[in-house]
């Protein structure tokens, strides 16, 4: 089964995320576990944790279909000592929050060298950050999201993702989330079934399909290879609807979260229904 959902709001508490996902006909969802634009947040309460787990149970969401995202402030490749320690501490907290909620994955952007060090040094720093977080937690997989290639952010080439995974000690607790807009912006074509399949074969060759834990389904406002991260509603951007129809029929993409991050949240239920219209599910 294809597990399509969206990155839903946690307004009023994390326990509302599964309810918000259920309302739009989702079979998976993503969320933040706290305010993503602040370094510090109040700990999750026992009541919130219990309500979240109960709501997931009642709505039929299993942990493997939920892909929480960490704070945008975290940079696990930061070259400065004070900033990397702050980011690593925050990331461990994010992993612990996911663990407390009974979740098995945490999605993160790999990091940026800020033009202060070279790519490989930054990739080593990112991998060391992941290793430390895995040592400090149990049961949660760190899921690297590919990036669009903007600025000094790494993760826009499959080789970057492969290098991080190579350096992570516990290979059973690292994975990848492929964002379609980011793929397209960084130069990987998806516009036809043939182009999509070629890109997925390249991912399998360089990284390995066994590491694919989820996808973000977004069309792109800018052209192929633009390195501009601007999401568009499905079928209204430069990728086009054929790619997303193909994803829904692709046998390698079963039972992983396929998460919408398209600009119009009001249209998510319609987009989800449209995607399921490409299948018999």
From Swiss-Prot:
Record InterPro entries: AP_endonuc_2, AP_endonuc_F2_Zn_BS, Xyl_isomerase-like_sf, Xyl_isomerase-like_TIM-brl
Binding residues annotated for Zn(2+) 1, in chain numbering: 69, 109, 145
Cofactors (names): Zn(2+)
Keyword match Zinc: yes
Residues of the signal peptide: none
One Pfam family of this chain: AP_endonuc_2
GO BP field: base-excision repair
Described function: Endonuclease IV plays a role in DNA repair. It cleaves phosphodiester bonds at apurinic or apyrimidinic (AP) sites, generating a 3'-hydroxyl group and a 5'-terminal sugar phosphate.
Similarity annotation: Belongs to the AP endonuclease 2 family.
HAMAP family: Nfo
Protein name: Probable endonuclease 4
Protein source organism: Chlorobaculum tepidum (strain ATCC 49652 / DSM 12025 / NBRC 103806 / TLS) (Chlorobium tepidum)
Lineage: Bacteria, Pseudomonadati, Chlorobiota, Chlorobiia, Chlorobiales
